[in-house]
Amino acid sequence: MKIVIQRVKQAQVSIENQIHNKISSGLLLLVGVGPDDGPDDLDYAVRKIVHMRIFSDQEGKMNLSVKDIEGEILSISQFTLHADTKKGNRPAFVKAAPPELASRLYDEFNQLLAQEVPTKMGIFGADMQVELINDGPVTIILDTKNRREEV
């Protein structure tokens, strides 16, 4: 999985010019599922996102997680994170998971997140417009295939 994590003051997703979901302070996630992703990737990503200390404490240090601040998550599916741009000028998306697998894993990912933090979603496969107010900005890229083996 490739996930772009953005710390936001607020964010919303609209579909067909109607607001579908919105959050106040928390995280906006752009979530790309790869063909080799599975339960281990979901667990790792959720654990990292929920506990990642990227919110400021009283001393201004990034020392608090989205869970600590009682924030929310807005999760948006985005297969384009798996774009292959090596050949030509048109990105290829052959490195993205097939829609059936991606949809299932995206749903499972969001269910796991929602067990930890209030989580809202876009609609998988929909044409969405996402608006946000970055906080910082703080933007982190998480790739579940690029992780240390935990002991």
Curated annotation (Swiss-Prot):
SUPFAM superfamilies: DTD-like. A Gly-cisPro motif from one monomer fits into the active site of the other monomer to allow specific chiral rejection of L-amino acids. Belongs to the DTD family. One of its GO terms (molecular function) is Gly-tRNA(Ala) deacylase activity. Transmembrane segments: none annotated. The gene is dtd. Homodimer. The keyword NAD does not apply. It is found in: Cytoplasm. It comes from Streptococcus gordonii (strain Challis / ATCC 35105 / BCRC 15272 / CH1 / DL1 / V288). It holds the Pfam family Tyr_Deacylase. InterPro entries: Daa-tRNA_deacyls_DTD (IPR003732), DTD-like_sf (IPR023509). This is D-aminoacyl-tRNA deacylase. NCBIfam families: D-aminoacyl-tRNA deacylase (TIGR00256). An aminoacyl-tRNA editing enzyme that deacylates mischarged D-aminoacyl-tRNAs. Also deacylates mischarged glycyl-tRNA(Ala), protecting cells against glycine mischarging by AlaRS. Acts via tRNA-based rather than protein-based catalysis; rejects L-amino acids rather than detecting D-amino acids in the active site. By recycling D-aminoacyl-tRNA to D-amino acids and free tRNA molecules, this enzyme counteracts the toxicity associated with the formation of D-aminoacyl-tRNA entities in vivo and helps enforce protein L-homochirality. It catalyses: glycyl-tRNA(Ala) + H2O = tRNA(Ala) + glycine + H(+); a D-aminoacyl-tRNA + H2O = a tRNA + a D-alpha-amino acid + H(+). GO terms for biological process: D-amino acid catabolic process.
